[in-house]
Amino acid sequence: DVVVVTSGYPRQPGMTREDLIGKNAEIIAQVGAGIRDHAPDAVVIVVTNPLDLMTYHMQKVTGFPSNRVIGQAGVLDSARMAHFIALELGCAEEDVSPMVLGGHGDTMVPLPRYTTVGGIPITQLMSQERIEAISARTASGGGEIVKLLERGSAFYAPGSAAAIMAESVLNNRRRLLPASCHLTGQYGLDEVYIGVPCLLGSNGVEQIFELDLSEGELASLQKSGNFYKNQLKDVLGY
């Protein structure tokens, strides 16, 4: 079984995802208890914001092995980056293979070095200035949608991202996708959920991959992970 958790208060204009911690933590506690009691063997895909914190909270509430509790942010963030690159180059989105790691928020880490269009690195297709602009827009894409909607937050792309992950689990597709996973030393981070490349199959996260990151990329990823780790301690008491 796969349970996709979307329950929670949506962002309003001017809010960060982290502004939702208190309200949505209570909802995740209730939903997690129900999953634990009625679907004890399920793989859980969390969509609720703030994503990485609520995924960690869900794992603690259910007591499930961490490989069976996953956050969907990386697939969503990568899809947004692919869309912006396709707009810039006038190419098909299907030809864009992006990679976005880190938390689902302002600290996310787009990786241009690992992003290609038709197998060609985007560093060879556009200027550094445009790459940086697209990376920044990727990080703020959710807020852009919230502002335009005025009430509520994004739903089409998150729904599509969750469906991609669920299909990989249900059919044991073993797709390599970026998702919020529980780290136990990978990338120098421990006891935190953060977006990293992983293999998704019938057991949930089958494997986490450690990319060869530059010093700056690794520092950005660790900064993102430590931000959420501090939030877990200071706000949720973990």
Predicted segment positions?
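N-terminal Rossmann-like NAD(P) cofactor-binding module of classical short-chain dehydrogenase/reductase
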Residues: 1-4
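Conserved NAD(P)H cofactor-binding loop of Rossmann-fold oxidoreductase domains
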Residues: 7-9
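Short, solvent-exposed loop/turn segments at secondary-structure junctions
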Residues: 12-13, 53, 148-149
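Short acidic, glycine/proline-rich loop/turn micro-motifs
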Residues: 14-18, 210-211
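Rossmann-like NAD(P)(H) cofactor-binding subdomain of soluble oxidoreductases
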Residues: 16-83
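C-terminal substrate-binding/catalytic lobe of Rossmann-fold NAD(P)-dependent dehydrogenases
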Residues: 62-68, 77-238
